[in-house]
């Protein structure tokens, strides 16, 4: 019985480990998600690959995408733009494929308005001390940027109430296990499968 794919939105404050958790999810065979690659104007970090981690584009190209309604969501964060190309997401969901979006909290809010049936998970740190430790250890930000990220994180954590689930990223393995349980439960929720069974009954 074919049905619409599941849209999973993974969000949380900067430095919480969204990218690390996402990568671990993609590697696990238990997950069958298609990953939507975001577009950004920020410079690549060491090890990041264009077209795999992000589409790294110029500011002019990003503005062109906004004007052409090519983005599901977009936002500016610490001087850089981030956005999710719309067409690939729609195509994969219509084909019955599950799609994983890893985006910031403002982007998630935009997606919620356009695709309210998505599953929204807020990834949170064990505490703010650990969050700052992770940002500092990343070694890519100045003290000024780190302070900006921590100030923003305090605001973003309070936005958790707009999500369906909260997952603590104490360890990547634990976070992935919790998300796996959420995905399994969401796939068998009656609102998601009832039409399949209605059609099955009609066919008989």
Swiss-Prot record:
It is found in: Cytoplasm. CDD domains: GMPK. Residues 5-184 form the Guanylate kinase-like domain. It comes from the Bacteria. GO terms for cellular component: cytosol. The keyword Nucleotide-binding applies. It catalyses: GMP + ATP = GDP + ADP. ATP binds at residues 12-19. SUPFAM superfamilies: P-loop containing nucleoside triphosphate hydrolases. PROSITE patterns: GUANYLATE_KINASE_1, GUANYLATE_KINASE_2. Keywords: ATP-binding, Cytoplasm, Kinase, Nucleotide-binding, Transferase. GO terms for molecular function: ATP binding; guanylate kinase activity. Its EC number is 2.7.4.8. Belongs to the guanylate kinase family. Essential for recycling GMP and indirectly, cGMP. This is Guanylate kinase. It comes from Lactobacillus johnsonii (strain CNCM I-12250 / La1 / NCC 533).
């Amino acid at each position: 019985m074919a049905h619409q794919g599941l849209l999973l939105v993974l969000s949380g404050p900067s430095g919480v480990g969204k990218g690390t958790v996402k990568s671990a999810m993609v590697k696990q065979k238990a997950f069958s998600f298609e990953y939507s690659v975001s577009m950004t104007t920020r410079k690549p970090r060491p090890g990041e690959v264009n077209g795999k981690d992000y589409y790294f584009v110029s500011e002019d190209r990003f503005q062109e995408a906004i004007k052409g309604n090519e983005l599901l969501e977009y936002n500016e964060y610490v001087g850089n733009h981030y956005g999710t190309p719309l067409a690939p997401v729609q195509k994969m969901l219509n084909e019955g494929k599950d799609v994983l979006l890893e985006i910031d909290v403002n982007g998630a809010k935009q997606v919620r308005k356009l695709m309210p049936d998505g599953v929204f998970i807020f990834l949170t740190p064990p505490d703010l001390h650990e969050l700052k430790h992770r940002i500092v250890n990343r070694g890519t930000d100045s003290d000024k940027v780190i302070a900006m990220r921590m100030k923003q994180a305090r605001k973003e954590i309070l936005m958790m109430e707009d999500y369906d689930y909260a997952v603590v990223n104490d360890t990547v393995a634990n976070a992935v296990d919790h998300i796996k349980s959420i995905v399994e439960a969401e796939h068998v929720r009656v609102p998601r499968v009832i039409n399949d069974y209605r059609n099955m009954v009609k066919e008989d």
